[in-house]
A protein has these predicted regions:
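Active-site-adjacent structural elements that line small-molecule/cofactor binding pockets in enzymes
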Residues: 1-273
């Protein structure tokens, strides 16, 4: 945990805008599921791969910093209880003094869903309802909900988030359903591993998803996540393309290890953004 504190403080000192933490409850020696962000479908995880719970990591990072935003990239929402999660999110929002962003997705590993006992086939519908539940709890003084999975009346959920009405909700994933979900349930869309030459058309597709949902595209945020191991010049080309397409932020995934991360942060801070 000391390394996490060091990385967070170094990120803030270099002027990086935000830190994002992934979620996987467990990992597996082998996967039947196809990883959607690699050419061969292999996630490339090591045998001893592991990550802290992202809400815990966000809290630790927030409590040793004062300006940098922290977020989940991404939290696998359908694996969670939404009433419990709503309370946990409020706690992180308070611990960070309103510097928390909630990035969520439906997950890609059926093995992980099997392990935690959550039906894989229902994860999309479960995600939509859970988003409704959490936003109701954060917004209403006395909350009621009727849905196919959860029903409750006369519920008081306090305290409310620092950010009004709640921390920004970023819907993670690719095109199609995640974009439609962002347009109907989210504050923004968080795409992952979009090639430089595909950024403009991807943002145009997000605009169309918003228009189909009768929502002004300008009210839906745009964020891209980029697994990256190239040069600063190559990254600058990507950032320029993202900026032209009105992407608000690019989250750069560079690898693991405290010393390596600090070095990469120093390099990123030198890029003219």
């Amino acid at each position: 945990m000391a390394d996490l504190r060091i990385v967070a403080q170094h990120a803030e000192s270099t002027g990086i805008d935000s830190l994002w933490f992934p979620e996987h409850v467990v990992f597996f020696r082998e996967y039947r599921s196809r990883y959607p962000y690699s050419a061969d479908g292999n996630p490339g995880f090591g045998r001893r791969q592991g990550v802290y719970d992202p809400l815990f990591a966000c809290t630790v990072a927030a409590t040793v910093t004062t300006k940098i935003r922290v977020g989940t990239s991404i939290l696998i929402l359908p694996q969670r209880n939404p009433i419990v999660l709503a309370q946990e999110v409020v706690a992180v929002d308070h611990a960070s003094d309103g510097r928390f962003d909630l990035g969520i997705g439906i997950g890609w590993s059926s093995e992980e869903f099997d392990a935690v006992g959550v039906p894989w086939a229902q994860r999309g519908a479960r995600t939509d309802e859970y988003l409704d539940v959490m936003q109701t709890l954060w917004r209403d003084e006395v909350a009621d909900h009727r849905g196919p999975l959860l029903n409750f009346d006369n519920v008081i959920a306090e305290p409310k988030p620092v950010q009004n009405p709640h921390p920004p909700i970023w819907i993670g994933g690719g095109r199609g359903a995640p974009m439609r979900r962002a347009a109907t349930h989210g504050d923004g869309w968080y795409g992952w591993a979009i090639a430089t030459q595909e950024i403009a058309e991807t943002m145009a597709e997000l605009d169309r998803a918003c228009e189909a949902a009768k929502r002004d595209p300008s009210t839906v945020g745009r964020k891209l996540g980029l697994p990256f191991g190239g040069s600063s010049d190559e990254l600058k080309v990507y950032l320029d393309a993202a900026q032209r397409a009105n992407v608000e932020e690019v989250v750069v995934s560079t690898g693991i290890g405290t010393d390596f991360l600090r070095q990469r942060m120093d390099e990123l801070a030198m890029i003219d953004r």
